[in-house]
Amino acid sequence: MKTVIYPGSFDPPTNGHLDIIQRAARVFDKVIVAVLNNPEKNPMFTVAERRKMLEMITKEYANVEIDDFNGLLVDYVREKQVSIVIKGLRAISDFENEMQMALTNRKLAPDIETIFMMTNHKCSFLSSSVVKEVVAFDGCIEGLVPEQIQDYIIEKRNSQRK
């Protein structure tokens, strides 16, 4: 059984993230979507909230599991006894950053492979940062994030303004 880990901040999950999850779920037997708890970032959503949103948008996929981790990705991947990490790429600028991280991971753990998957061209401009900026200015996030979590994101924004 081939299992892959798809790590990320997912703050919040976007249609680009969902595109990678859906396609990975077709290619691999099991996809573990791993939410990074990065204490150096100031996320809009807690790890629990990000997990909840990911569970909401992937509930129809029996082979997708949502998890979270702290620390080095390679340590988490080994803990899960997985040898493949999948990363989504939107543009050449993503490749440069992801390639550097993949090579670092290879140096730390030569037994772990990184596979790059191109995001659907319709999502090539999309990032969690773009979504957060649009929602901060009361813009419409329809088409940027999965429909199931649009209200959740707007409610979070509204609660932060109180």
UniProtKB/Swiss-Prot annotation:
- What cellular component terms from Gene Ontology apply here? cytoplasm
- What's one Pfam family the UniProt record gives for this protein? CTP_transf_like
Q: Which locations, inside or outside the cell, does it occupy?
A: Cytoplasm
Q: What class of enzyme is it?
A: transferase
Q: Which domain of life is it from?
A: Bacteria
Q: Which InterPro entries match?
A: Cyt_trans-like (IPR004821), PPAT (IPR001980), Rossmann-like_a/b/a_fold (IPR014729)
User: Which biological pathway?
Assistant: Cofactor biosynthesis; coenzyme A biosynthesis; CoA from (R)-pantothenate: step 4/5
| Residues in the signal sequence | none
Report the EC code(s) recorded for this entry.
2.7.7.3
Q: Which GO terms describe its molecular function?
A: ATP binding; pantetheine-phosphate adenylyltransferase activity
Disulfide connectivity for this sequence is none
Is the Coiled coil keyword given for this protein? no
State if Magnesium is listed as a keyword: yes
Keywords for this protein = ATP-binding, Coenzyme A biosynthesis, Cytoplasm, Magnesium, Nucleotide-binding, Nucleotidyltransferase, Transferase
Q: Might you name a Gene Ontology BP term for this protein?
A: coenzyme A biosynthetic process
Site feature (Transition state stabilizer) residues: 17
Where is this chain primarily localised?
A: cytoplasm
Q: Which cofactor does it need?
A: Mg(2+)
- Residues binding substrate are 9, 41, 73, 87
Reaction catalysed by this enzyme: (R)-4'-phosphopantetheine + ATP + H(+) = 3'-dephospho-CoA + diphosphate
Q: Which residues bind ATP?
A: 9-10, 17, 88-90, 98, 123-129
Q: Which family does it belong to?
A: Belongs to the bacterial CoaD family.
Q: What does this protein do?
A: Reversibly transfers an adenylyl group from ATP to 4'-phosphopantetheine, yielding dephospho-CoA (dPCoA) and pyrophosphate.
Subunit info here reads:
Homohexamer.
Q: What is this protein called?
A: Phosphopantetheine adenylyltransferase
Provenance organism: Natranaerobius thermophilus (strain ATCC BAA-1301 / DSM 18059 / JW/NM-WN-LF)
